Amino acid sequence: MKTTLSIGVLAALCLSACASSGPITAATPGPAASAGSKVLTVFAAASLTGAFGDIGKRFESANPGVKILFNFAGSQALRTQIELGAAADVFAPANTGEVDTLVAGKLVISETARIFLTNQLVVVLPAKNSAELKSLADLSKPRLKIVLAAKEVPVGNYAAQALGKLDASLGAGFKDRVLANVVSYENDVKQVVAKVQLGEADAGIVYTSDAVAAPDLKKIEIPADSNVLARYPLAPLAQSKNPALARSFIAAVLSAEGQAILQRWGFAPIR
């Protein structure tokens, strides 16, 4: 039977963990910090690239001799890699479902997982906006080129949910008309952003954090009642070779400094 993580329990865990204040500090001494075992491998959603990169640099500075190896990709691809035996110490996908699957496979211990941030969606447009898109309703105009993430990717699934919600305000069939304009489905959110930046698409639906990381793009906001709240979980892997170091990195992400970095990159605290 598949074990499903309780959002309420995860939120409570996060609130407790996030209560810690202060900067990113040195890891607690232990086996993981001994010579020859100072490499920490973190598998994280592509949308976390910039923020985790910054947190990682600060963590390495606070812990001389420690090297963090990041693997950023679509959450479902990362989960599959872990299931196939890829070595990882920490997993941070963009939805709870990927962690649920690993809990069921005994690759993550449920009690160690926690939600540590939230994100929402926004429509991004090329800087030139040659299609002259001004509103969400314009996305249903015929012959546009729209790029989305694949439905297996969290942001692709969230985009489909948001488009469905917009049917209520923009008219039945709006979602179908928008999907008729989709010219490609990408493997992660960064690929969606790249195609819009290159002018290969008139619009794409990405996370708010990705729009913050790409200030050259124009954007159209999605109203809160039609948007989707993405909750990101964070967990050490049960087979981690560096469990103490993994816990220390997670503590760094949950620290006041770590949370401030995440918010600078456009993420929001849990709510």
Put a short name on every predicted segment.
Residues 1-8:
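Bacterial N-terminal signal peptides that target proteins for export
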Residues 14-17:
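C-terminal motif of bacterial Sec signal peptides marking the signal peptidase cleavage site
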Residues 19-62, 67, 71-72, 76, ...:
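Exported/periplasmic ABC-transporter solute-binding proteins
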Residues 112-116, 121:
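Short, glycine-/small- and polar/acidic-enriched structural segments
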